[in-house]
Amino acid sequence: MAHPLQLGLQDASSPIMEELLYFHDHALMIVFLISSLVLYTISLMLTTKLMHTSTMNAQMVETMWTILPAVILTSIALPSLRILYMTDEINNPLLTIKAMGHQWYWSYEYTDYTDLNFDSYMTPTLDLKPGELRLLEVDNRTVLPMETPIRMLISSEDVLHSWAVPSLGLKTDAIPGRLNQTTLSATRPGLFYGQCSEICGSNHSFMPIVLELVPLKHFETWSTLTS
């Protein structure tokens, strides 16, 4: 999860987030190289006394500054499109969870079980236990199995919301009357925190998301005791 004074992205805990981190570094490297080239060119122009006074056209230069940007943009677009298709690809999910946004809480339904659903509200500051995080803890955590393909169905019952868990690379809009889906697969156990990422009213900041990823056997035990 995030920590104070953090400058970079959160540690990746899913294959999608790992790909996003690689793409971030790839794009940032290209931006750094272009910025360095531009600054170098500007410094040369400011320090040199040479001037082109008789040049009417420079077809070679015009060709190069047309081809090079196209190559650079292609090198950025192709990995981006690959990740975009990866986020939409869902292959034989073993579990389907439906998340509904409300003002201002989330409700979850485990559609593979007959009676396993609950509402998830933010824990008030006065009710926090030692070690719990202010504005991020909930009364009912969403327990999920790790290393398992999970399909998330996301919608809303009132206004626009957005279901986001940064360390898993997840952010999907919750739109009234529309059912969006995304895939989730965590590579390690633990607690993963997120929040509503769409301004949805006065208590928008009080819609935390807490996913508790556990081994499959522990999840089966929890689901049996809960349902």
Curated annotation (Swiss-Prot):
Cu cation A1 binds at residues 161, 196, 200, 207. It holds the Pfam family COX2_TM. It comes from the Eukaryota. The keyword Magnesium applies. Binds a dinuclear copper A center per subunit. Coiled coil: none annotated. It catalyses: 4 Fe(II)-[cytochrome c] + O2 + 8 H(+)(in) = 4 Fe(III)-[cytochrome c] + 2 H2O + 4 H(+)(out). GO terms for biological process: ATP synthesis coupled electron transport. Keywords: Copper, Electron transport, Magnesium, Membrane, Metal-binding, Mitochondrion, Mitochondrion inner membrane, Respiratory chain, Translocase, Transmembrane, Transmembrane helix, Transport. Its EC number is 7.1.1.9. Its main location: mitochondrion. It is a multi-pass membrane protein. PROSITE patterns: COX2, COX2_CUA, COX2_TM. Residues 46-59 are mitochondrial matrix. Belongs to the cytochrome c oxidase subunit 2 family. Component of the cytochrome c oxidase, the last enzyme in the mitochondrial electron transport chain which drives oxidative phosphorylation. The respiratory chain contains 3 multisubunit complexes succinate dehydrogenase (complex II, CII), ubiquinol-cytochrome c oxidoreductase (cytochrome b-c1 complex, complex III, CIII) and cytochrome c oxidase (complex IV, CIV), that cooperate to transfer electrons derived from NADH and succinate to molecular oxygen, creating an electrochemical gradient over the inner membrane that drives transmembrane transport and the ATP synthase. Component of the cytochrome c oxidase (complex IV, CIV), a multisubunit enzyme composed of 14 subunits. The complex is composed of a catalytic core of 3 subunits MT-CO1, MT-CO2 and MT-CO3, encoded in the mitochondrial DNA, and 11 supernumerary subunits COX4I, COX5A, COX5B, COX6A, COX6B, COX6C, COX7A, COX7B, COX7C, COX8 and NDUFA4, which are encoded in the nuclear genome. This is Cytochrome c oxidase subunit 2. The gene is MT-CO2.
